[in-house]
Amino acid sequence: MLKHTAKALVCALSLTVAGIVQAADPIVIKFSHVVAEHTPKGQGALLFKKLVEERLPGKVKVEVYPNSSLFGDGKEMEALLLGDVQIIAPSLAKFEQYTKKLQIFDLPFLFDNIQAVDRFQQSPQGKELLTSMQDKGITGLGYWHNGMKQLSANKPLREPKDARGLKFRVQASKVLEEQFKAVRANPRKMSFAEVYQGLQTGVVNGTENPWSNIYSQKMHEVQKYITESDHGVLDYMVITNTKFWNGLPEDVRGVLAKTMDEVTVEVNKQAEALNQGDKQRIVEAKTSEIIELTPEQRAEWRKAMQPVWKKFEGEIGADLIKAAEAANQAQ
């Protein structure tokens, strides 16, 4: 009798424990970003959510908050470190206070094209940067392309002297401030969500952005000219809170890491196509004149802005800059 009772208790306990496991709340990952869903980052966040919830049903729930709907670009880093959000994908200009080395991505005319950026990011030096902020509580999960930056303004920008005196919106980056000062323009820090209104009201006269940002934020409606300068890159590092990441069950962390790697490949594959598509949509809208620089004009811009490299060489490291330059040579 006691034997049967013990067996019954064991079975009941097993069912209870199983019920508790089944009823356990899923791990919630809040993924916050500041751009539209149509952009490479917006599409990447949605794909990450889809794949994670398919692969970890009931275990992990991913909530995506686009367009600064949860945190703006001035608050999202603090929110990540406080644990109020688990994944964000700030532009590479946003890490200045955590590591000076990531300023390398803001140096003007360092990379010839997005393929060179990709080669550097996949190099040992590029991958090392992903883990360079773990002592600050930040773990990098991957680089997502947004695209090469174009200059826009309400006057034609063909030569460096054309930018003189104009007010350009910049991210909070000392490198980008110096980039515009090099052509005697006036940099103005402004959050991404405020750029359209800033351009519309004349608080700023111009900006720098990839085609997808220009189109998705309708900047072409308030900018008469866009110069296809490809003078710099605006990419993102997808990051998480180190304590949160290390505290995840090992199997869950493994699935998330593998999924992020797959999504990164897809985002970076689609980014250039999306940018070119948005460029064409801007052309068809006929609200802005697209200016193509001659090789000689582009060389003038490069000559005017390249001295910025020397100003930040000590903080970034000459060897790291050389490694980035080497990525311009196709393998």
Curated annotation (Swiss-Prot):
Induction of expression: Expression is maximal in early exponential growth phase and declines with cell density to reach a plateau in the stationary growth phase. Induced by the C(4)-dicarboxylates succinate, fumarate and malate. Positively regulated by RpoN and the DctB/DctD two-component system. Negatively regulated by DctA.
Signal peptide limits: 1-23
Keyword Signal attached: yes
GO biological process terms, semicolon-separated: C4-dicarboxylate transport; transmembrane transport
Paired cysteines (S-S): none
Disruption phenotype: The dctA-dctPQM double mutant shows no growth on malate and fumarate and residual growth on succinate.
Transmembrane segments: none
GO CC entries: outer membrane-bounded periplasmic space
Keywords in alphabetical order: Periplasm, Signal, Transport
Superkingdom, taxonomy of origin: Bacteria
Compartments where found: Periplasm
Entry function: Part of the tripartite ATP-independent periplasmic (TRAP) transport system DctPQM involved in C4-dicarboxylates uptake.
Cited NCBIfam families: dctP, TRAP_S1
Assembly and interaction partners: The complex comprises the extracytoplasmic solute receptor protein DctP, and the two transmembrane proteins DctQ and DctM.
Entry similarity comment: Belongs to the bacterial solute-binding protein 7 family.
Note: The DctPQM carrier is more efficient than the DctA carrier for the utilization of succinate at micromolar concentrations, whereas DctA is the major transporter at millimolar concentrations.
Protein name, UniProt field: C4-dicarboxylate-binding periplasmic protein DctP
Organism: Pseudomonas aeruginosa (strain ATCC 15692 / DSM 22644 / CIP 104116 / JCM 14847 / LMG 12228 / 1C / PRS 101 / PAO1)
